[in-house]
Amino acid sequence: MKEIKLNSDSLEIYEKSASKKLNRNDLIDLWNLDLNDLLDISYALKKLFNKDKIDLCSIMNAKSGICPENCIFCSQSKHNSSKIDTYELKSKEEILKNAKSVEKYSNRFSIVVSGKTVTDLEFEKIIESIEEIQNKTKLKVCVSLGLLNKDQLKALNEKNVRIHNNLETSENYFKNICTTHDYNDKIKVILEAKKIGLEMCSGGIFGMGESIDDRINLFLDLKKLGVDSIALNLLNPIYGTKIYDRINSGDISPINSIGALKSLCIARITLPNKVIRLCGGREHVLKDMQKYSLLAIDGLMIGNYLTTNGQNIQSDLKMIEEMGFER
């Protein structure tokens, strides 16, 4: 990668971010900066804290659909009418096979299930799958299992896994995307997980009609919570979801590539020493501008997502190499 020479204004932002002296007004003002300046600042911070590496992760939709929650963006919600495959929890053999299929590319593998939480029987089976993956691959294991209780979190801590629980958006905007559970339900799980000693991955989705203020408030909450890995998605509206209808009617404007890249940069500047991980929707929103996201992020989800297909893994590896990054 080329060496970055920051102009005086960009250098001031870089130094304030690195020393954690940026306030909320500073972050709001970032939106008005030129994208190239934001990318330069982000890349300088990335080099300072996380070097020229991209951490790769993959997920498996281990239980799909018929979710009782009413998240307007999710094709797995029974409140939406998307046509997707639905199935109960996959066997440990199927989960292990999926993990092994991405082992040569990914550093992390996450078991993801639909629903507000898991049953006791499902949890026992997931623990068995975690053990299988840890014993038979070199992958680090993550799980996304909804709103877990203290005993479940303690059991997962004993298995040395990372927990994923997305806040999705700001506290103020959350009621616009889901009403069957609230923001504080998620906060409680994250706080309990951190208290127990678990690594935590959390983040949100850009493009659901939220404001720039909402995105910044999300970043500040993630910072306050001490989340280890920040998972950021770009909305790929799926036919049959409530949000697809709202975008199609013009009620919500879809996020564009410039807005997405600026948001990723502001996440980096707000959380300079955290892993910023770009996940679903990047192919749909960024298209041929995906490569520029690598200047702001240091984690990338590869392979397929929960109910949509991802970019060819070889294309991702080529993109990373051509941009001069390691994995």
From Swiss-Prot:
Binding locations of [2Fe-2S] cluster: 110, 142, 201, 277
Top-level taxonomic group: Archaea
Chain residues that bind [4Fe-4S] cluster: 67, 71, 74
Pfam families: BATS, Radical_SAM
Coiled-coil segments: none
InterPro entries according to UniProt: Aldolase_TIM, BATS_dom, Biotin_synth/BioAB, Biotin_synthase, Elp3/MiaA/NifB-like_rSAM, rSAM
CDD domains (UniProt xref): Radical_SAM
EC annotation from Swiss-Prot or TrEMBL: 2.8.1.6
Catalysed reactions, semicolon-separated: (4R,5S)-dethiobiotin + (sulfur carrier)-SH + 2 reduced [2Fe-2S]-[ferredoxin] + 2 S-adenosyl-L-methionine = (sulfur carrier)-H + biotin + 2 5'-deoxyadenosine + 2 L-methionine + 2 oxidized [2Fe-2S]-[ferredoxin]
Gene Ontology BP term (one): biotin biosynthetic process
Cofactor binding note from Swiss-Prot or TrEMBL: Binds 1 [4Fe-4S] cluster. The cluster is coordinated with 3 cysteines and an exchangeable S-adenosyl-L-methionine.
Reported cofactor(s): [4Fe-4S] cluster; [2Fe-2S] cluster
Keywords: 2Fe-2S, 4Fe-4S, Biotin biosynthesis, Iron, Iron-sulfur, Metal-binding, S-adenosyl-L-methionine, Transferase
UniProt pathway: Cofactor biosynthesis; biotin biosynthesis; biotin from 7,8-diaminononanoate: step 2/2
Domain named Radical SAM core: residues: 49-282
GO-annotated molecular function: 2 iron, 2 sulfur cluster binding; 4 iron, 4 sulfur cluster binding; biotin synthase activity; iron ion binding
Quaternary structure and partners: Homodimer.
Protein family: Belongs to the radical SAM superfamily. Biotin synthase family.
PANTHER family from the UniProt entry: BIOTIN SYNTHASE (PTHR22976), BIOTIN SYNTHASE, MITOCHONDRIAL (PTHR22976:SF2)
Role according to the record: Catalyzes the conversion of dethiobiotin (DTB) to biotin by the insertion of a sulfur atom into dethiobiotin via a radical-based mechanism.
The protein's name: Biotin synthase
Species annotation: Methanococcus maripaludis (strain C5 / ATCC BAA-1333)
